[in-house]
């Protein structure tokens, strides 16, 4: 198993440890851990074994034969690699966190430079904004971002407190006061959706599928920032790859395969593939085939486990209404579920994993398809195939509502999702309306647009540890109806 740092349990032990440190001339707890690890490494070497430890074991007194496994990310890993140590990456490959598979697939094993993104010329115009994003557990995520308008359009970067600068992607402005962009972070795919008004900033950060409110203000100058730690070409040989991690707080044997598969296939391909193998659309096509093959020919249990959980939740009823309802849903991404359990004093190994959220895969294939069909229809209003596909799914959901509601009345474990069923019903009706509008290139006036957006904002809230992910393709359709 991987070594990790712990703390002493009592004052008695602390006094004994402090005396030992004075005797050995050890300045601090890090030096004490290095002393222990040096002795342990010698024992392991005697038996031809390799020491592997998390970032905390790194110490210049340890031999270069140790292997650092990084949870702290590319910066920490890049630093130890530059010092001549070998390392593997786990940040971005945490399968206990529900995340989009494309996020894992984009994960950078080799730390990337900025390639001039933060170089501001006299002909550029730049604006910088601070932000603070409170979390459900722990301190707020803080930092700043800078957007630069140049001859080639918009570019930008983000500076999270305590982390290196990262370039941002897909910058879009909606008028002069609304903006969004994307950046992959330790929290997952991070998409700020912001409104700026004079010198104030509001809105939310979308972490995967889950919204976290954010506030901030305009800065007078561009912050200095910390450049990313990028190893030289000859040092990159010390980056051996990565390892997926699956912590057990939200995992039990009956749902283990739901957590693992098929995302672990994409992580494996990321780790054994060249850096330029990064076509997410192609990956998803092959992932679907792997999902089917691994179920039928290998015997992996992700679909069987889901059906078993649905059977238990249905309490003697048909599981079909749950299967259809689940198409619109995903478990809340990032560590949202763990943090909600912490707030409710349920963050322990005795917490029963019996919610609908526990039976859901990290990502809804149906929602991803809805997003794809919406994009096609927006780019070509005469694409009747995409319009029909959208209407088919929304109609299927509408026709399922009565049966899904009946299940929530007959199962105490489903009682908490009664509001979810009602909202999916409204969203299905809205989906058909928006599809028809986009297909005929219709528009909504400002009042109607605001009303629909408010409905989507309400439906996007986390409920019983899950999210109605169908909100996001509907938002895409809604934006296509706005008169700019």
PLM segments and residue spans:
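Gly/Pro-rich turn-and-neighbor structural signature
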Residues: 11-69, 74-79
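C-terminal functional modules
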Residues: 240, 244, 249-255, 262-484
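N-terminal-biased segments
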Residues: 29-30, 38, 124-131
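Conserved alpha/beta catalytic core and glycan-binding cleft of carbohydrate-active enzymes
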Residues: 58-64, 71-123, 219-303, 375-379
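Alpha-helix N-cap/helix-initiation motif
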Residues: 2, 26-29, 253
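Central antiparallel beta-sheet cores of small beta-barrel/beta-sandwich binding domains
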Residues: 127-218
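Single conserved hydrophobic/aromatic residue that forms the stacking wall/gate
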Residues: 2-5, 9, 13
